[in-house]
Amino acid sequence: YPVATALNGVGQMSGSECTPLGHHTIRAKIGDGAPINSIFVARRPTGEVYSSALAERYQQEGKTRDWILTRILWLSGCEIGQNRMGNCDTMRRFIYIHGCPDSHQMQIPSSHGCIKMRNTDVVDLFDRVLVGERVNIILSEDSSSVRHNITA
């Protein structure tokens, strides 16, 4: 699946807004059965459904919003001192694999640390994986960016 990762690149630290590297597990699956484009805030559905008109309204009001849509796979680090515990804990950083607006370009860094996917892709992945399954986030071959694909 093509994905989008952090605008700030890779990194482990809280507040960095970077995508963490290394071995993780799926801590929780959130949104099972929710309609495509359902909006989540703090891992809870708001009851809203994303549309370009809603996004435009937010823009006109001068508001910005990081749209977390459709499904959430909440990640937890497995490597103490690397992505688990302390100031580098992936779970406490609220790093997810989640859906985003269909207009969002994949394979271009743009998130605040999460891994964004197309909504239909995140539903497909969500249905294929179980809580506790491993996720390995690695650099691409040129070692300058996170690989912008997920293989299930």
Please place each PLM-identified region on the residue numbering:
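Histidine- and aromatic-enriched segments that form or immediately flank copper-ligand environments
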Residues: 1-7, 88, 95
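N-terminal post-signal-peptidase region of extra-cytosolic proteins
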Residues: 2-18, 54-59
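Generic alpha-helical scaffold signal
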Residues: 17-20, 67
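Short, flexible surface segments
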Residues: 20-21, 131
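Exported/periplasmic cell-wall-interacting domains
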Residues: 36-152
